[in-house]
């Protein structure tokens, strides 16, 4: 494994959540609430990604279920190619715009050049999986974290 560029040091503040792409929030929700005892926040539509999002949490664990809300949602394409499963890892950052600039300076390819509104008042941006060993990553500025 290669050593990350020094520009990345200190950008993230830990894992924010793991996102899982699902065909149906209702079906997946039952598994996480019943079998795992997780609690859910209200479902929210995220226009920039054309998805419905259900955040589930338990202690320090946080999972985000993402369901496509339109045929042209990036998650629709993901599900068609890969089926349900882990969609992305999300990293908590203090300032999404500064994190984007630092990652660009370090040579990483970003999908988003500026923060976009995420669920529950967050600002988000995605890092292209070609820059991260095949893993889609999200930067999350969360005023509630």
Q: What residue spans do the PLM features occupy?
A:
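Conserved active-site tyrosine of GNAT-family acetyltransferases
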Residues: 28-33, 103
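Mid-chain, well-packed structural core segment of small domains
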Residues: 78, 82-106
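Residues within well-ordered alpha-helices
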Residues: 28-29, 52, 99
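Vicinal oxygen chelate
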Residues: 2-11, 54-55, 91, 100-145
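Conserved short beta-strand elements that form part of the metal-binding/catalytic scaffold
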Residues: 39-80, 120-144
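N-terminal beta-strand motif that seeds the catalytic metal site of vicinal oxygen chelate
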Residues: 1-29, 84-93, 142-145
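Conserved acetyl-CoA-binding loop of GNAT-fold acetyltransferases
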Residues: 34-40, 107-110
